[in-house]
Amino acid sequence: MKITRNQFLKLIPAAALTLTGCGSKAQPANTESLVFSHHYKLDYAQQFTADCYEGGYTMLTIAESDARFLVVPEDAAEVDGLPADVTVLRQPVENIYLVSTSVMDLLLHLDALDSVAFSGTKAEGWYLPAVQQAMEEGKIAYAGKYSAPDYEQILAAGCRLAIENTMILHTPEVKEQLEHFGIPVLVERSSYESDPLARMEWIKLYGILLGREEQAEQVFSAQETAVQPILSQEPTGKSCAFFSLTTNNLATVRKGSDYVARMIAVSYTHLRAHET
């Protein structure tokens, strides 16, 4: 007998799928089970922090929402006495439902495409050939956009994490439903970083999540080094105006503090948009 989506959802025991919420102020966890070691060094990123604890535990805190995620090594002991707002992510973090498209390129640089099971974008919507191929080969499945995920498909595959961007905040009921089903939701904020290197530094967050910190630091260091020759050049004295056209043929200009404006500023040109 076929059942409807609503009937399917009602069959899932809510008690087994309950997930603690997020919302406390960003502080290193103060429990008897966790011993604080040090703050993970970030040179540019302002939208997340990482606190390291003895035993390989790492607490990730996302700015604004103050959502906290404790990354626990695969064979590490359970942690007792955690604050109620902390979401535990035990490694390996796999079968990810990836909605935030900007994250995919970072995962590719970490050789972590196999950690993604579901995409919020169809194959034809990707500009990354490796992702298109993975979807065409059935290694990554389309599971619906951010506002309409295929809950049955995601649950059946044992999804361990949904990575969303702030668009999900327009449909909070979807985030709540995913969390109700026991799927942690990480709302990444890399797009709120004003510095290009700060955006790139988010690769360290995914390195921590996936147990690839060293690789993430190597990738970031290489990109930072590649930018240095540009930063050491003298200003060109040239001016630049940047705009784009929407699908409605309207011209839009970025703010002077915008990420794109900052990229142009890094190249030492003067922005016409600076005064807007």
Segments predicted by a language model, with ranges:
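Conserved small/polar residues in nucleotide/adenosyl-binding loops
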Residues: T269-T276
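Bacterial Sec-exported substrate-binding components of ABC uptake systems
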Residues: C22-M104, Q215-A241
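N-terminal export leaders
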Residues: R5-L9
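Extracytoplasmic substrate-binding proteins
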Residues: N95, E152, A156-A251
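A short, structured surface patch at a secondary-structure boundary
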Residues: T58-E64, R68-L155, L161-M167
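Short, structured coil segments at secondary-structure junctions
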Residues: A112, F181-G182, S267
